[in-house]
Every structure is written in structure tokens, then in C-alpha cells.
């Protein structure tokens, strides 16, 4: 066989091998693209509910409470009765801890993934009969029936939440603010240090002080007009 014929045969064999390998490469490329694309979509679907609330105006970002914060909240609930509600309950640790102390406890959370996870945790820890978790916007919920309110707030939402709770809560209610205090209310108790600090507000005592201030201001006005 001449040299030219050998070269021609080699080229034909290479062409056949190349043509048969291309579909396989193309197939694997499509599969890889599909897997990567599906993974990204799944990650987006899972991550979006966690990230979105933090980006919305006047909503609570998910920042888990520390062990010390949970203990400080429970100390402020000692000798209290009635239902405990956690506004922006996150992964449910405050609600579950309160239930373990004998309270009926409720959590409101905008993120459905966190609500489902909280329900699972409550079931796993044996307190699901004493807990309730709801997917809800805190601004659309009335808290008038609750005697013990826990809130892990952020500074920009505290003034508006202060007005809402002052309007809705009864005199027997106690509000426990974590991480940030309310701007106008005077706390009855302050416990802890740094990010673990909690501020406790008893609505009955607060309203008595407010009423006395209003009476005093009216007397001042009358004195100036006499």
C-alpha cells in the first residue's frame, strides 16, 4: 500500500471517530447544562424566601437568637401567665423554649420555609401540641389577645411597631424587646449586655405614667391661661 493511500485511510478513520464522538459530547454537555441550571433554580427557590424578607421595607431579617438571648427572654417570662407570642419567630427557638417552660406559644413569621422548619423542630422536640406557627405579615396581625410579646426588631421598624402595640395590647401585657429598645417607651427592666440585652415593658405601668404626664400637662396649660 502506498504512502498516500495510508494517509487517506487514516483521515477517513479519524473522520468516522470524530463524527461518532460529537453526539456523545453534545449529549453530555446538554445533561451537564440541565443539571447546573436545575441546581441554580432550586437554590434560588430555597434562598429567595430567606433573603427577600430582609430586603423588604419594615420587615424582620432572619438573625437567629443566641443561647444567651433565649435565656434572658425566659428570665423575663418568669411568673408570667398567658400566651407567649414571638413576632418574627424565625426558626422557632423562642417559641419552642417558651413551650418547654409550660407556656402556650405562638410564632408569626413571613418566611414559609422557616415556619415549616419551626413546626418540624417543635414536633421533634415534643412540644408541637403547645406551639403554633403562622405565615403572616406582622403588620396585618392583631396582637390584642396576647399577654407576653417578644420581638427581635430592627431600629427602623421600632417606632411604628411601638404605636401598633400600644394601640392593641391590654394593660396586663408585657413586651420583651431584644437587640433594640423602643424609642419612646421607658423599660421597667433591662437585663443582659451587648447584643444579648433585653428590655421589658409592662403596658399597664407605662400607661399610668403616660396618663399622669397628660394630666400634668393639662394643669400646666390651665395655669398659664389663668
UniProtKB/Swiss-Prot annotation:
Annotated GO CC locations: mitochondrial crista; mitochondrion
Its EC number(s): 2.1.1.-
Entry's transmembrane regions: 35-55
GO biological-process terms attached to the record: peptidyl-lysine methylation; peptidyl-lysine trimethylation; positive regulation of proton-transporting ATP synthase activity, rotational mechanism; positive regulation of sensory perception of pain; regulation of mitochondrial ATP synthesis coupled proton transport
Annotated GO MF terms: protein-lysine N-methyltransferase activity
Annotated InterPro entries: FAM173A/B, SAM-dependent_MTases_sf
Signal peptide: none
Subcellular location per the Swiss-Prot or TrEMBL entry: Mitochondrion membrane
Repeat keyword on record: no
Record region (Required for mitochondrial location): 48-82
Topology class, membrane: Single-pass membrane protein
UniProt entry keywords in alphabetical sequence: Membrane, Methyltransferase, Mitochondrion, S-adenosyl-L-methionine, Transferase, Transmembrane, Transmembrane helix
Stated family: Belongs to the ANT/ATPSC lysine N-methyltransferase family.
UniProt function note: Mitochondrial protein-lysine N-methyltransferase that promotes chronic pain. Involved in persistent inflammatory and neuropathic pain: methyltransferase activity in the mitochondria of sensory neurons promotes chronic pain via a pathway that depends on the production of reactive oxygen species (ROS) and on the engagement of spinal cord microglia. Protein-lysine N-methyltransferase activity is dependent on S-adenosyl-L-methionine.
Protein name per UniProt: ATP synthase subunit C lysine N-methyltransferase
Amino acid at each position: 500500500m502506498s504512502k498516500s493511500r495510508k494517509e487517506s485511510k487514516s483521515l477517513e478513520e479519524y473522520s468516522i471517530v470524530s463524527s461518532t464522538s460529537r453526539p456523545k459530547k453534545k449529549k453530555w454537555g446538554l445533561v451537564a447544562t440541565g443539571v447546573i441550571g436545575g441546581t441554580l433554580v432550586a437554590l434560588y427557590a430555597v434562598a429567595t424566601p430567606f433573603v427577600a424578607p430582609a430586603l423588604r421595607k419594615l420587615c424582620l431579617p432572619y438573625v437567629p437568637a443566641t443561647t444567651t438571648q433565649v435565656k434572658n427572654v425566659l428570665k423575663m417570662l418568669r411568673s408570667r401567665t398567658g400566651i407567649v407570642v414571638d413576632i418574627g419567630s424565625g426558626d422557632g427557638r423562642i417559641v419552642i423554649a417558651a413551650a418547654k417552660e409550660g407556656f402556650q406559644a405562638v410564632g408569626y413569621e413571613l418566611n414559609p420555609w422557616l415556619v415549616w422548619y419551626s413546626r418540624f423542630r417543635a414536633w421533634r422536640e415534643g412540644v408541637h401540641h403547645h406551639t403554633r406557627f403562622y405565615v403572616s405579615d406582622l403588620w396585618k396581625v392583631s396582637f390584642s389577645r396576647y399577654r407576653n410579646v417578644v420581638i427581635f426588631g430592627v431600629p427602623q421598624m421600632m417606632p411604628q411597631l411601638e404605636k401598633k402595640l400600644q394601640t392593641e395590647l391590654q394593660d396586663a401585657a408585657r413586651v420583651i424587646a431584644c437587640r433594640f429598645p423602643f424609642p419612646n417607651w421607658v423599660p421597667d427592666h433591662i437585663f443582659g449586655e451587648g447584643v444579648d440585652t433585653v428590655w421589658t415593658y409592662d403596658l399597664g405601668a407605662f400607661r399610668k405614667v403616660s396618663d399622669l404626664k397628660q394630666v400634668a400637662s393639662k394643669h400646666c396649660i390651665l395655669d398659664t391661661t389663668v
